[in-house]
């Protein structure tokens, strides 16, 4: 009976609705205006560095991390700062926000260039400058995650994408495998973690095959197919399935010798190390009953959901 309960706790069999798995990301129209929040991560809010009337570019740092557990914020558009003002978050709290009127040019900031990384200190500084946080949903600052007090022997890449509808991570693996590998190798090299396991649910055979080919000559990286059950992507379950270890109650993955990164997070890191472009856009899946044409889209940060042309406004909640 206990074994049955344990198996049930490690995932639930749910119907897969991955209709967008083959949908290559389509660029979303550039919004006329964006509101970029200074609190979009776990930890202290960033401190706004710009004022009304300032000109900004794609990649301009507009928010400075407000503490050790915090993150830098960068402009996703080029244009002019229309306002720096308080904004109420969904949890009822207030935070500063930067409103930018876009100029439609998407001019890249001249300061954007690949970081010079030579050792662990410069690597962690680059990750912090990038403003990278967990893109799987938690939003924890990546540079902090990569500095655990515990001894860690495994970098675990969460590529399971077990959520029933989402396929953006699938497209990230298919389209950006070189960035993923670059990010992984950098983490291993500069943190001293000896090995990496990429956990992918077995309903993504193309992703498994591609990443196996990309890593076949690297003994430090293993691609591990996982059962396609809902819940596999929860990091505590992922650790047990990939490493056979349990995280202590109230503990962190590092207490089980692992650091867990989402596959899009490590891909974004790989892109940043090659180009110097911080987190200013991402691929997301738009799907569901209110969407006439489910698809993956590439959107600059803080593009409004209602800008998606195939959404049925009448079937969306008023707050969306």
Feature-to-residue mapping (PLM):
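Short, well-structured beta-strand-loop connectors
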Residues: 51-64, 83
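Conserved small/polar residues in nucleotide/adenosyl-binding loops
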Residues: 303-310
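Hydrophobic alpha-helical positions that pack around
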Residues: 194-300
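Acidic low-complexity segments
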Residues: 83, 88-145, 149-150, 205
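Conserved hydrophobic positions within beta-strands
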Residues: 79-81
């Amino acid at each position: 009976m206990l074994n049955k309960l344990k198996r049930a706790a490690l995932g639930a069999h749910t119907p897969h609705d991955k209709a967008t798995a083959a949908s290559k990301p389509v660029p979303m129209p550039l919004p006329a205006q964006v509101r970029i929040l200074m609190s979009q991560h776990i930890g202290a809010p960033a401190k706004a560095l710009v004022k009304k009337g300032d000109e900004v570019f794609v990649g301009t740092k507009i928010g400075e991390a407000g503490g050790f557990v915090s993150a830098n914020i960068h402009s996703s558009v080029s244009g002019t700062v229309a306002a720096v003002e308080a904004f109420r978050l969904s949890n009822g709290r207030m935070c500063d926000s930067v409103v930018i009127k876009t100029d439609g040019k998407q001019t890249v900031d001249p300061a954007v260039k690949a970081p010079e990384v030579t050792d662990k200190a410069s690597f962690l500084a680059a990750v912090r400058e990038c403003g990278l946080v967990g893109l799987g949903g938690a939003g924890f600052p990546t540079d902090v995650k990569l500095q655990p007090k515990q001894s860690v022997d495994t970098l675990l890449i969460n590529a399971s994408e077990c959520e029933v509808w989402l396929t953006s991570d699938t497209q990230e693996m298919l389209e950006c495998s070189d960035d993923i590998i670059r990010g992984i190798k950098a983490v291993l090299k500069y943190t001293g973690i000896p090995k990496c396991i990429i956990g992918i649910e077995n309903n993504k055979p193309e992703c498994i095959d591609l990443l196996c080919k990309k890593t076949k000559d690297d003994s430090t990286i293993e691609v591990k197919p996982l059962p396609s059950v809902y819940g596999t992507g929860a990091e505590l379950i992922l650790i047990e399935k990939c490493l056979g270890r349990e995280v202590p109650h109230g503990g962190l993955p590092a207490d089980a010798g692992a650091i867990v990164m989402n596959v899009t997070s490590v891909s974004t890191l790989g892109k940043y190390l090659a180009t110097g472009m911080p987190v200013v856009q991402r691929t997301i899946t738009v799907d569901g009953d209110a969407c006439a044409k489910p698809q993956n889209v590439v959107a600059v940060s803080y593009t409004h959901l209602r800008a998606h042309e195939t959404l049925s406004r009448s079937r969306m909640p008023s707050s969306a």
